[in-house]
A protein has these predicted regions:
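Sec/Tat-exported extracytoplasmic proteins
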Residues: 16, 41-44, 59, 73, ...
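Conserved hydrophobic positions within beta-strands
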Residues: 1-3, 55, 78
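Short proline/glycine- and basic residue-enriched helix-capping loop/turn segments at helix->loop/beta transitions
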Residues: 54-61
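Short, Lys/Arg- and Gly-enriched loop/turn segments at beta-strand edges
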Residues: 45-53, 95-98
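Catalytic nucleophile loop of clan PA
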Residues: 68-89
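Conserved active-site neighborhood of the chymotrypsin/trypsin-like protease fold
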Residues: 1-40, 45-49, 62-67, 117-120
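C-terminal cap/linker of serine protease catalytic domains
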Residues: 1-3, 23, 85-129
Length: 129
């Protein structure tokens, strides 16, 4: 795979490969409080980790969730109860016991707009060797 775009601030990348692989479908629906979600990732280095939870709230680009998100899980998909991707897990808060994901709107806006500015900072750019 090659890096097409990279967002260092949010620890996210868009990769491309010449191989045909199965892909997850993106949801057309916004999440709401109580919505069931599943987070996939590599929690604490354990590849293929899954955690289940619910949406606590949805605010702009942030989805607040009850799923356990630990080191290595960031960048993994947040899946709804129909199997569609609704976000990308991005942070955890151990003390408050809630975690977060970036909504697809927030992620896709940056992915599609290389010059997109978020909070006054240009975050996405073409990756150059």
């Amino acid at each position: 795979a090659v890096i097409v775009k990279w967002d260092e601030e949010n620890d996210l990348a868009v990769l491309a490969t010449g191989r045909k692989m199965p892909v997850l479908q993106l949801s057309d629906n916004a999440p709401w409080p109580g919505y069931w979600v599943m987070a996939l990732g590599t929690a604490d280095g354990y590849e293929g980790s899954v955690s289940f939870g619910n949406v606590i709230n949805f605010s702009g680009n942030d989805i607040f969730i009850t799923n356990n998100i630990s080191s290595g899980s960031s960048g993994g998909p947040l899946i709804d109860n129909e199997g569609y991707v609704i976000g990308v897990t991005s942070w955890g808060h151990k003390v408050q016991q809630y975690n977060g994901a970036m909504s697809l709107d927030g992620f896709c806006a940056k992915t599609l707009e290389c010059e997109y500015e978020f909070k006054g900072v240009k975050t996405w750019w073409d990756y150059k060797d």
